[in-house]
Design a protein with these regions (language model features):
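Carbohydrate-active enzymes and regulators
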Residues: 19-154
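Sec-dependent N-terminal signal peptides
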Residues: 4-16
């Protein structure tokens, strides 16, 4: 009986084709216009790349106030981005207003960061939902699970 199980297991291992998804990594620009976001060309680049690669999924961690400047300085790219961000290709993973280090501020301040940031993103991109929160370690704090649940994060 053990021999039969061994043969079946061997056949399963031989016949099973292991498949892994292609992973992509896109760096940077989370600092907004005061950090690293090159306003003159970056938004158009994002839109063009998503159009060229419809199978791509990206996460944006860009300060919400950045979109005020993008709307003024590159209105064409901004309009195109508005159409793209409501698709399944784009997710905003940190909608806090100033992307603060949460470990050194109070719960009320963190709640306001989420309120102001989500309101700003919704002003520019109505219909966007927030599912995932993904940031660097200094942005974590003990009250974060409750706050994320309050704002509807999954």
């Amino acid at each position: 009986m053990n021999r039969l199980y061994s043969i079946i297991l061997l056949v399963v291992f031989i016949c099973t084709h292991a498949h892994s998804q292609q992973a992509y990594f896109v760096d940077g620009y989370h600092g907004g216009i005061y950090g690293h976001y090159p306003v003159k060309w970056k938004t158009q680049f994002i839109v063009d790349q998503l159009s060229k690669h419809p199978d791509w999924r990206i996460c944006l961690e860009i300060e919400p106030e950045t979109w005020d400047t993008v709307q003024i300085q590159t209105p064409g790219a901004y309009r195109q981005l508005k159409n793209v961000v409501v698709s399944k290709q784009v997710e905003f993973t940190n909608p806090t207003y100033a992307q603060p280090y949460c470990y050194n501020i109070s719960g009320e301040s963190i709640i306001r960061q989420f309120q102001y940031g989500i309101a700003k993103i919704n002003k520019h991109f109505p219909g966007v939902t927030f599912t995932t929160y993904s940031v660097e370690e200094p942005c974590f704090t003990s009250c974060l699970p409750q706050i994320l649940k309050l704002f509807g994060f999954k």
